[in-house]
Regions:
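N-terminal secretory signal peptides
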Residues: 1-38, 43-52
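N-terminal low-complexity, Pro/Thr-rich disordered segments
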Residues: 54-108, 233-234
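Core segments of small alpha/beta cavity-forming domains
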Residues: 93-157, 254-258
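Second-shell loop/turn segments in exported
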Residues: 100-105, 248-258, 290-293, 310-318
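A short, amphipathic edge element
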Residues: 154-171
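Exposed beta-sheet edge and beta->alpha loop/turn motif
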Residues: 176-221, 226
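Catalytic cores and adjacent binding grooves of peptidoglycan-active enzymes
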Residues: 206-237, 253, 265, 277, ...
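Extended, low-complexity, intrinsically disordered C-terminal regulatory tails
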Residues: 259-292
Length: 367
């Protein structure tokens, strides 16, 4: 697995983590390992900090990592490490901000369990804190299996400090006794020279029901693949469109040339009317529709998930009328199916809804 591609690069990522995350919880309490005093010390370490932009055993437990769709451009090898750019010195790491469930979340405790683990793995404040051993210790302190850290390597690193925040968390599937939580993450890392690198990834976290809380069984980081040198016009247009807000893995999916033009053109059409917050495109999604043996459209580059439009979260019941209208608009841009919080045609073939799709819109395409 290509580590560089797992930690997808976004040169245009905002300087402040969470700037495009209106649903991420407000900071409630700083972990003792990274309090405000520690952050101030990190800001002046090495002179001052700078800000860098870099951007179960069954088939159903696997996460999308597939080849390009038929007819897609060929790809070039990935660079050995993420590219970076350095801003002026003097900016500290953003403060940790634990995920807090908003209105309308289905079984928020399930998401919270998955996200606590990822935040713990990807946040540290001292030299060696990004090592496998140190991250495993943080999971152990939470009462979780420390071996899970071995599956979350994109969040580890040699830097002396890092902060990981949740941009969005949606279900890849939620059943009575099992679940898939798709966590879209931003991560800042403070390097030894006092510079901050901004990057991120998406992780598919698998859980099973247990007492007193759900238990994590696996973590599957996104693996978008290398960027192509022959990206089509629709892909270039999506990447350049300021009204399409892409997380790191989704941006890398598009840059790889592994997303069908029908999906990209639909996103552009939606962006004429809304500011579109994308959560998932291809990588980081279960290969099979959760709980079934049916291949998902996502790993084939034939689907896109959206968690907010014009800053309005799909999951929030207060936005229901707006979301229903948006689902109808989405159906007009070419998908064969639109999933969301409401089944607008009562069992017809265009719309569908279930517990999994209360927190995002899903647009699936035949080609």
């Amino acid at each position: 697995m290509n580590r560089c591609c797992d930690f997808a690069v976004d040169p245009a990522s905002p300087a402040a983590l969470g700037a495009r995350s209106p649903h991420a919880g407000d900071m409630t309490e700083l972990p003792r390992s990274l309090d405000r005093r520690t952050l101030l010390r990190l800001a002046v370490a090495g002179g001052a900090a700078g800000l860098v932009g870099c951007s179960s055993a069954s088939p159903a437990t696997r996460t999308a990592k597939t080849s390009a769709p038929p007819g897609s451009p060929s790809s070039t090898p990935a660079s050995p490490s993420p590219s970076t750019s350095v801003s002026a010195r003097g900016v500290a790491l953003s403060a940790p901000r634990p995920w807090v469930a908003g209105p309308g979340e289905v079984d928020p405790a399930v998401k919270r369990q998955a996200l606590r683990a990822l935040e713990a793995i990807g946040t540290w404040s001292s030299a060696g804190g990004g090592s496998l051993a140190a991250a495993s210790g943080r999971l152990r302190a939470l009462g979780m299996d420390p071996k899970l850290t071995e599956q979350a390597h994109p969040l580890l690193g040699a830097e002396p400090a890092a902060v990981t925040r949740v941009v969005d968390a949606q279900y890849g599937g939620i059943l009575v006794s099992s679940a898939s939580v798709l966590a879209v993450l931003d991560q800042q890392r403070l390097d030894a020279a006092g510079h901050v690198r901004a990057g991120g990834t998406t992780v598919d976290v698998r859980l099973v029901a247990a007492s007193p809380r759900w238990r994590i069984t696996a973590m599957h980081p996104a693996s978008p693949g290398p960027a192509t040198t022959a990206l089509g016009s629709a892909g270039r247009a999506v990447l350049a469109n300021p009204r399409v807000r892409l997380p790191h893995a989704a941006r890398a999916d598009i840059a790889s040339g592994q997303v069908h033009a029908s999906v990209l053109e639909a996103v552009l059409a939606l962006a004429h009317r809304y500011v579109v917050d994308v959560s998932i495109v291809r990588s980081g999604h279960p290969i099979y529709v959760f709980g079934t043996s049916r291949l998902s459209d996502h790993p084939r580059g034939r689907a896109v998930d959206v968690w907010a439009l014009d800053g309005r979260r799909i999951v929030d019941p207060a936005n229901r009328a707006f979301v229903e209208s948006a689902m109808r608009v989405a159906a007009s841009v070419g998908p064969y199916q639109v999933g969301g919080p409401v089944d607008l045609d009562g069992g017809g073939s265009t719309y569908f809804s279930d517990r999994t799709h209360q927190d995002h819109l899903h647009l699936g395409f035949h080609t």
